[in-house]
């Protein structure tokens, strides 16, 4: 299984996010390595959004897909992208 280092994955996610026209709506990004219930590994990507009520969720779909595609180029683990309202 092709796996990039944690820092490579994090950098790839950051590059993808900051190229997005929605970058100004985000206040943070976190990437964590996780295990599923079946013993498989995946990457949890959390995008901290400045205000979940300031846009429609479908506006984030292209960014989520871009992150999933970018991670897939360097790592075979699935990138599970989630949104969270920034504190």
Provide a role label for each language-model segment.
Residues 44-62:
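A short interface-forming secondary-structure element
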Residues 63-69:
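Low-complexity, intrinsically disordered Gly/Pro/Thr-rich segments
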Residues 3, 53, 57, 84:
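Short, charged/polar micro-motifs that form catalytic or ligand-binding hotspots
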Residues 23-48:
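Short edge beta-strands and adjacent turn/loop segments
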Residues 69-87:
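A short amphipathic beta-strand at an alpha->beta junction
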Residues 35-37, 51-53, 87:
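Residues that cap or initiate secondary-structure elements
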Residues 1-32, 61:
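N-proximal, solvent-exposed amphipathic alpha-helical segments enriched in charged/polar residues
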